[in-house]
Amino acid sequence: TDRSRGLGDVYKRQEFWMVEPEIAFADLEDDMCLIEEMVKYCIQYCLDNAPEEMKFFEQMVDHDCINRITKVRDSHFARMTYTEAIDHLLKADVKFDNKVEWGIDLNAEHERYICEEVVGGPVFLTDYPKEIKAFYMRLNDDNKTVAACDLLVPGIGELVGGSQREERYDVLEKLMDEKGMNKETLQWYMDLRRFGGCKHAGFGFCLLYTSPSPRDRSVSR
């Protein structure tokens, strides 16, 4: 995938490989459950099928990588809303490089503080402000947040981002209007809702960030 974002953050790249499943008849909780199962499966698969590579990483790159991913595999992935995360960050006895306030797109330093210092393990952040998320994410009843989630893990920050998709045509149209989007170019997408859809969800799993290497250049090809 490719996205327009500055390169100031080593974990926020403009181009990277992803796996992007879509799940029919699923809500946000279903989405998070599948994400947790998939991440744990991938960790176990690497430990079982690439033991020499994992030992190499542990010896040459990150001496704690096997222990860290094993802890992720054995952990229950916690849940925390975006608003709760902002409250924790505002109360933190830490000076962040980037300002903290409700409505910001969290930086890696914020994400890692939440999962490493507040939770001490993997955590799903949910219910983000609609202004900082994509137009197709389902609007919550408060009309301020959307049914989105980001999985944060120690040592990395955001690993997976997902959401329940907006299946209601009128709400989707309003969200697009609020963002000033050209609906004519996305009429085909809107027609999928106009002529019948279903509750569904999906996510993007950033394969690039699963490597223990601190230099993504070595795993980006």
Residue map of PLM features:
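Single conserved hydrophobic/aromatic residue that forms the stacking wall/gate
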Residues: T1-Y11, Y209-P212, D216-S220
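Class II aminoacyl-tRNA synthetase-like tRNA-binding/catalytic domains
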Residues: R5, D9-A26, D191, G197
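Short conserved micro-motifs at the rims of enzyme active sites and ligand-binding pockets
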Residues: D9, E29-C33, F135-R138, S163-Q164
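A generic structural motif
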Residues: E20-D31, G155-G157
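A residue-level signal for conserved active-site and pocket-lining positions in enzyme catalytic cores
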Residues: P21, A85, L125, G162, ...
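Hydrophobic (often cysteine-bearing) scaffold residues that line and stabilize catalytic clefts
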Residues: D31-I35, T81, R168, F203
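Metal-assisted phosphate- and nucleotidyl-transfer catalytic regions
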Residues: E37-V153, E178-C198
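Active-site pocket scaffolds in enzymes
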Residues: S163, R168-S211, R221
